[in-house]
């Protein structure tokens, strides 16, 4: 379990999640925005590693 967004401010995390998720998984921007806890990245984002 990685806390990727822990190193980023909450607002910056939201922005990054929205942009990156939109580019990588177009139909799921809300999922990334909703999972600010980082669980989404831990399971679905290789770049978090």
Swiss-Prot record:
Highly thermostable. This is Astexin-3. Shows weak antimicrobial activity against its phylogenetic relative Caulobacter crescentus. Does not show activity against other bacteria tested (E.coli, Vibrio sp, Burkhoderia thailandensis, and Salmonella newport). It is found in: Cytoplasm; Secreted. It comes from the Bacteria. Coiled coil: none annotated. The gene is AtxA3. Is composed of a ring composed by 9 residues, a 5 residue-loop (SVSGQ) and a C-terminal tail. The peptide is threaded when the C-terminal tail is inserted throught the isopeptide-bonded ring. The loop region serves as a recognition element for the isopeptidase AtxE2.
């Amino acid at each position: 379990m990685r806390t990727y967004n822990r190193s980023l401010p909450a607002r910056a995390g939201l922005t990054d999640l929205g942009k990156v998720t939109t580019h990588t998984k177009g139909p799921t921007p809300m999922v990334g925005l909703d999972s600010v806890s980082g669980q989404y990245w831990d399971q679905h984002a290789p770049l978090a590693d």
